[in-house]
Amino acid sequence: MKKLLIILAATLVLVLGSSGNFREYYGARGVAVNIADNNSSYIGFECPEMTLYLANGDSTGVISVKNNLGEDVELYFSTPNDILTFSNPTFLYAGEEKLVEAEFRGSQGEYTIPIDIEAFWDNGSAKIPACSVKVVDPAVRMSKVLLSGNTTVPLFTREVWKFRILVESDAGDNYTILDTIPAEFEVLSIAASDGSFATHHPGAGRSCTTKIVWDVYVEGTEFMDVTIATKHNPAGKQEFTSPGSYNLNDGAEIKGLGIVSNPIIVKAVR
């Protein structure tokens, strides 16, 4: 359930702000700050409720803002010690909404970072204490890269893909990487740069998934390359049988740390 924050402080009236795609992607706290006499005039903003996993130098969207002042506005964003740095200013036309990116400049650790906004428009200005984002720069990072294969494929046609699970660690430690290959695919080959791995097939027959468990010591970078293909379903038909989006995998996870990679998604079309 989304949280509705209502805060009364001096002449600032906080009400529920607009959402847009930012909320759909992150899940976010929506707030709008009144900065004019007319109660219909406000600057709305949202910060993600999820933790952002970033390394020093990474950039991502950290706050969504909407201009409901009825006139154009110029916004300047800041954080303590500039741990998040913004390409100020951000210009918004009346009614415009924008996801604002920032670059993380910090070392390994966990941070709760408050964001402040200064707004300037023809008839005035305001300083707005906005919201906070949680950023973690972990000792280990993981991502997935599609090495070969198409991202748009026809129905009832055998397709082959090769993707890489990339694990990076500055500290040097032992990790267990878990991944799941959905039932629509068969695993053709697995090759790891180091460590040991095993596969498991919970369920039975053609409808079972493939679980990959990879134990590896990482100091620097290690990787695993996985080659998969669409298989025949229990009815004997070649996947994919229905148009839509399919995950080649569900996002690898580092066991015990809650760090999950991006999934790789393909689209089946008629």
From Swiss-Prot:
The keyword Signal applies. Residues 1-23 form the signal peptide. The keyword Signal applies. It comes from the Archaea. Keywords: Signal. This is Uncharacterized protein AF_2077. It comes from Archaeoglobus fulgidus (strain ATCC 49558 / DSM 4304 / JCM 9628 / NBRC 100126 / VC-16).
